[in-house]
Each structure stands twice: as C-alpha cells, then as structure tokens.
C-alpha cells in the first residue's frame, strides 16, 4: 500500500542548531509513524534568499519598537555578511551538508510568499511545526505557518507548534482566531499554548512533546 504523504512547513535554513534539529526530528517522527514526509522548502524571512513582498508583511499592525528592532537585526545581518568569518562560512557549509544527507525537501523551493500561494505543493496532509512558528513578534506574514496556502479539502494539522508568548496582542487576535480555525487538528509545544488556543477559539489543543 502506498504511504500517505505529509508536507511539513517549519522554520529552517536560518543557520540555527535548534531550528535544524527540530525540523529533522519532525520529519523523522512522521516517517517513523508510517508516513512519507518531506519538508516544504519555503525560505523563512530571516533567510537571505527570501524575497520580501507587500503580501508577506505581518498580517496585523506591527509595533514601532518591534520594527526598529527588526531593522537593527537586518543591518547587523548585512554587516556580518560583509565581514563573514571562516568559522561562519564553515558552519553554513556544514548545515548545507546536513540538509543533503538528512532532510528531504519539496522539489520546488519557494523564495516568495506569492510563489507558495499561487503554486502550492500537493500532499495528502499538511503539517506545521515544531518551533515558534506562531510567534507574533516575527516580522512576516504568518499565514504560511497556519497552512493558509493549503486547499480547504486537505487535512491540516500542527505538531508541537509554539506561540513563543503567553498572550496575543489585541490587534492580532482576529487574525489568529481565523488562522487557528483553519486547522483540522492543533498540537502545541507548551501548556500555555493549550490555554491560549482555548482562550482564542474555544477549541481543545493537544499538548505534545517537541520531537
């Protein structure tokens, strides 16, 4: 019997050990559960290959202080690229080697928000997680991480996803409620996430261990 396919979207390719390990572990556990899983190669907004668009901006009014912080991080990132040390280059190379040997990615790489929504990959089910994929402090449109690009007839679930905060800003609550309702099943990493989902939607989320 052919295995059911699962497409996973998560935070990856940001040269961070935690992000790399959680993405590998999520894919690995899906495979161990009997599914044919692969990672949707959508570049996170912090990846230098990601192309920003108007539609990829945060889906709620972003606080000025957070915008200033994001701009500061952007400047620091550009400076680091100019004066990139051999150790940083080596680290990036090792991450790329890890991807080749241990991760399985979608055939197409999505560098833009519009690419993902206009031509989404096809799977039997879609998963988001783990990591802080729902953190409202992220300066990007979180719709991809709520699987809004997925056809409504498909199974959409989160696995050990994290908000990274204990509450959602009032200005973003409407969007979060709508996005959470888009998911067929909800699994979160922290107990506070269970409470937050209940508070926002009245739904019962499953508290599950980060893979």
Regions found by a protein language model. Give the residues of each.
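Alpha-helix N-cap/helix-start capping motif
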Residues: 24, 190-191
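Short, structured coil segments at secondary-structure junctions
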Residues: 152, 182, 200-204
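Helix-loop-beta element that forms the nucleotide-linked donor phosphate-binding surface
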Residues: 194-211
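Aromatic- and Gly/Pro-rich donor/ligand-binding loops
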Residues: 5-17, 21-178
């Amino acid at each position: 019997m052919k295995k059911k396919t699962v497409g996973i979207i998560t935070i990856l390719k940001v040269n961070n050990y935690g992000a790399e390990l959680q993405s590998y572990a999520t894919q690995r556990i899906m495979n161990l559960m009997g599914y044919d899983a692969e990672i949707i190669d959508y570049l996170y907004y912090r990846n230098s290959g990601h192309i920003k668009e108007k539609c990829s901006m945060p889906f709620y009014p972003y606080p000025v202080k957070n915008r200033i912080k994001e701009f500061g991080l952007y400047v620091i990132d550009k400076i680091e690229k100019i004066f990139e040390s051999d150790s940083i280059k080596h680290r990036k190379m090792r991450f790329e080697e890890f991807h080749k040997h241990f991760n399985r990615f979608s055939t197409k790489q999505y560098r833009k928000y519009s690419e993902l929504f206009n031509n989404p990959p096809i799977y039997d089910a879609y998963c988001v997680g783990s990591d802080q994929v729902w953190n409202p402090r992220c300066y990007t449109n979180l719709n991809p991480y709520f699987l809004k690009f997925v056809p409504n007839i498909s199974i959409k679930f989160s696995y050990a996803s994290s908000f990274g905060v204990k509450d959602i800003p009032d200005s973003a609550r409407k969007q979060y409620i709508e996005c959470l309702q888009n998911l067929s099943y909800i699994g979160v990493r922290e107990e506070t996430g269970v409470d937050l989902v209940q508070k926002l939607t009245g739904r019962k989320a499953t508290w599950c261990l980060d893979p």
